[in-house]
Structure formats: C-alpha cells, structure tokens
C-alpha cells in the first residue's frame, strides 16, 4: 500500500511540474474590457522582434523581444489616435511569477507618445533568457533604475485608474 502511495505521489508531482512549466511558458494579456488572450512562447518567438542595447546592472547587453505596443495592439488594446481623453488614465500592470508587479502608463508604451520602445524580451545577447530571468522579461530602455525591468513575466493587464 505504501509503495502505491509513493508512486501516486511521484506521478502527481511530475504532472504538477509539467503544468507549472507549461504555465511559465505562456503570457496572459487582459484588456481594460476584460478580454483575455493567452500567448505561448512559440507565438511570442514568432512575432516581429526588435533589439535594444542597454546596460543591465552596468553590464552591456542586447535584448531581443516584441515591443509591448505590438503585443497590446494584437490583443485589441487601441493605441495611437484612439488613446486620448479618459483613455489616458489607462495603465499596464505587469505581473511576475514571484508576484512582483509594476505599472506603465499606456502613453509610455504607445509610439505615438513615446520615443522609446519598451519590450517583452525573450533573448539576451542572442540566447534565450535563462530560468532566472525568463522566459519573458520587460526591458524599459531609458529608465534610470531597472526596477521596472520585470523578470519572469506571466501577465499584462490593462486597466483604467479612477
């Protein structure tokens, strides 16, 4: 009986590990209207990428990833001429696996307002992000401190500040 219980626990742990690994390889985007879209690592890897050259803790690095504006537009978030008036109160909450969260105003992300591209990186110096950083990381060139460079990103949520 104890041996069966042991095997059951082993199998359950394997399935749990597999489920956590799969969840870690996806990104959930939720719009201000509550519409949710989940992207896989493969879908993100297949999206148009840009490269940004930055210093990460005083070390030169090149990150490759998808501009947040591209990801949000693909999920149905209206940017550009549609981002005006009351919609300028909308923000993007970035969620990490360790429950760390940061906020960006949508205007910071929108190329119609901002001169920099904030990206969801999946590569650093030509290699996939390691488990400590990835699979996804926010890179915000121009921030004086990297406090909003979220590692292990799991979700992007748009909401209006009231």
Predicted regions located by residue number:
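Bacterial N-terminal signal peptides
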Residues: 9-21
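N-terminal secretory signal peptides that target proteins for export/translocation
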Residues: 1-6
């Amino acid at each position: 009986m104890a041996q069966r219980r042991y095997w059951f626990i082993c199998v359950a742990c394997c399935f749990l590990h597999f489920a956590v690994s799969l969840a870690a390889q996806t990104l959930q985007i939720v719009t201000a209207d509550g519409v949710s879209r989940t992207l896989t690592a493969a879908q993100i890897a297949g999206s148009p990428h840009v490269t940004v050259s930055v210093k990460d803790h005083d070390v030169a690095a090149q990150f490759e990833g998808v501009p947040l504006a591209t990801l949000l537009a693909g999920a149905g978030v209206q940017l550009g001429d549609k981002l005006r008036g009351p919609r300028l109160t909308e923000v993007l909450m970035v969620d990490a696996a360790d429950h760390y969260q940061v906020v960006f105003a949508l205007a910071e992300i929108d190329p119609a307002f901002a001169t920099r591209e904030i990206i969801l990186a999946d590569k650093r110096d030509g290699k996939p992000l390691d488990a400590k950083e990835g699979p996804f990381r926010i890179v915000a060139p121009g921030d004086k401190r990297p406090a909003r460079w979220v590692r292990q990103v799991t979700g992007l949520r748009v909401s209006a500040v009231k």
